[in-house]
């Protein structure tokens, strides 16, 4: 299934350190040649300061059991630089520890004033803290790096040349330490910055494309992520446009989120539209499963695609944890759609489709109807399942209306903003004609 593997393309939009979990995950699969994969990991890790990881990868490649002199020297240099940076920042960090116990840390301006007044804080100290945070990150010490990055965020002005780098670094470090709540906060902060920054159209598109890929890691690991990924990828026009323009393969993750989110079935209609629009640029078993089921009503095709979906998900680092849930919810979708179209279906036919015994299938269907709150009845004597009409609840109708209006509002806001920028640029260009 290498033709459906997205690791190579996803890694193009991830920080080097964020690619390591994906590459190590692939090492446990039989998709690529293990030797070539380890060589690529070694090539990538050599560009960092993670000397121990480099040595471990060399051992896995049977290159050497002893650390080469070059690596010994490099490790000594890394430790020396780290010590120097820590010494430069130590006085300020000691002051920060003292101030943590007071109320000043809660307010950025008060905190900076206290540092300047009582501890002779200067811009050079901030630069040193930034360098140390970045160096710790390059060494793979992500947890300690987050402390210095947090300090930089409190002290730095959003206009600082390094502010955007700190936002990206903080998000990456929180992802790598699996702090999903904080990672979501950092993701939201970074998205707000990107959406409000004065980037060119190309720069904004690039920033959003990177953010989309990083956010997938957060969304599939955070309890609220399944709703948030739908809101961001499907109902925020700027991000949907970025997906359609730069990374249509992200449709896999959006489709997966909709399938496993039973409370957001109202998003299916909008998702199917986008899948059909992008079908000429990207297709995979997950998007094709939804097309088979909701566009072509090809139930046999959907059943076959579901089998392929299992293989795809099993080999995708981002969504492998959703495998069982995806299969269960996909079966539910097949059942719902099939029964609503045919209205009356024999239990034996469903049992055959589900690879179950008739009595097991009947119990499964009873529980399914009860849990999914479907309007259906089972005639045990005739062995039939009879489906009634399933009206859309007022709540679902309201959610659909809100999503639709929100999407249109954002689209209009984007148009107004672009026209305003064009007008400003035109006025600026015209002003030069007088000189």
Swiss-Prot record:
InterPro entries: eIF3e, eIF3e_N, PCI_dom, WH_DNA-bd_sf
Gene Ontology terms describing biological process: formation of cytoplasmic translation initiation complex; translational initiation
Tissue: Expression levels in females and males are relatively similar 10 days after oviposition, however by day 15 expression is higher in gravid females than in males (at protein level).
Top-level taxon: Eukaryota
Entries under SUPFAM superfamilies matching the protein: Winged helix' DNA-binding domain
Keyword Cytoplasm: yes
Phenotype reported upon loss of the gene: Homozygous lethal at the first instar larval stage. Larvae are smaller than wild-type and die 3-4 days after hatching.
Pfam families on file: eIF3_N, PCI
Stretches assigned to the PCI domain: 219-392
Any one of the GO CC terms: endoplasmic reticulum
Keywords from the named record: Cytoplasm, Endoplasmic reticulum, Initiation factor, Microsome, Protein biosynthesis
Molecular function (Gene Ontology), one example: translation initiation factor activity
Compartment annotation: Cytoplasm; Microsome; Endoplasmic reticulum
PANTHER family, alphabetized: EUKARYOTIC TRANSLATION INITIATION FACTOR 3 SUBUNIT E
HAMAP family: eIF3e
Function of the molecule: Component of the eukaryotic translation initiation factor 3 (eIF-3) complex, which is involved in protein synthesis of a specialized repertoire of mRNAs and, together with other initiation factors, stimulates binding of mRNA and methionyl-tRNAi to the 40S ribosome. The eIF-3 complex specifically targets and initiates translation of a subset of mRNAs involved in cell proliferation. In addition to its role in the eIF-3 complex, also functions in protein ubiquitination and degradation.
Assigned protein family: Belongs to the eIF-3 subunit E family.
Quaternary organization: Component of the eukaryotic translation initiation factor 3 (eIF-3) complex. The eIF-3 complex interacts with pix. Interacts with mxt.
Name of the protein this chain belongs to: Eukaryotic translation initiation factor 3 subunit E
Organism from which the protein derives: Drosophila melanogaster (Fruit fly)
């Amino acid at each position: 299934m290498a033709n459906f593997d997205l690791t190579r393309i996803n890694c193009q939009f991830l920080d080097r350190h964020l690619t390591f979990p994906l590459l190590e995950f692939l090492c446990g699969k039989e998709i690529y040649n293990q030797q070539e994969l380890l060589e690529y990991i070694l090539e990538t890790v050599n560009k960092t300061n993670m000397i121990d990881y480099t040595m471990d990868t060399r051992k896995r490649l049977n290159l050497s059991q002893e650390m080469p002199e070059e690596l010994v020297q490099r490790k000594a240099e890394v430790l020396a630089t780290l010590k120097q940076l820590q010494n430069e920042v130590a006085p300020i960090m000691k002051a920060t520890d003292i101030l943590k116990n007071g109320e000043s840390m809660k307010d950025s301006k008060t905190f900076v004033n206290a540092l300047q007044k009582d501890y002779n804080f200067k811009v050079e100290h901030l630069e040193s803290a930034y360098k140390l945070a970045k160096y710790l990150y390059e060494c793979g010490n992500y947890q300690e790096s987050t402390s210095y990055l947090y300090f930089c965020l409190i002290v730095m002005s959003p206009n600082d040349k390094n502010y955007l780098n700190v936002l990206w670094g903080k998000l990456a470090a929180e992802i790598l330490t699996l702090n999903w709540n904080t990672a979501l906060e950092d993701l939201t902060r970074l998205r707000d910055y990107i959406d409000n920054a004065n980037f060119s159209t190309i720069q904004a598109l690039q920033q959003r494309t990177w953010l989309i890929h990083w956010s997938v890691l957060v969304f599939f690991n955070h309890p609220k992520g399944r709703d948030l990924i739908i809101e961001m990828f499907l109902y925020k026009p700027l991000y949907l446009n970025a997906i359609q323009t730069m990374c249509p393969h992200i449709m896999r993750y959006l489709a997966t989120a909709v399938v496993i989110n039973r409370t957001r079935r109202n998003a299916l209609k909008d998702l199917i539209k986008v899948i059909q629009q992008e079908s000429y640029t990207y297709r995979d078993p997950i998007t094709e499963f939804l097309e088979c089921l909701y566009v072509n009503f090809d139930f046999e095709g959907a059943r076959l695609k579901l089998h392929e979906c299992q293989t795809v998900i099993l080999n995708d680092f981002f969504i492998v944890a959703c495998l069982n849930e995806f299969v269960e919810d996909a079966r539910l979708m097949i059942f719902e759609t099939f029964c609503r179209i045919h209205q009356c279906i024999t239990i034996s036919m469903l049992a055959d489709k589900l690879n179950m015994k008739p009595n097991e299938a009947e119990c499964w269907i009873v529980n399914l109807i009860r849990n999914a709150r479907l309007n259906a009845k089972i005639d045990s004597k005739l062995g039939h399942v009879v489906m009634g009409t399933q009206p859309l609840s007022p709540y679902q109708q309201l959610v659909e209306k809100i999503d639709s209006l929100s999407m249109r509002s954002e689209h209009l806001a984007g148009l107004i903003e672009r026209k305003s920028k064009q007008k400003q640029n035109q006025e600026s260009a015209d002003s030069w004609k007088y000189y």
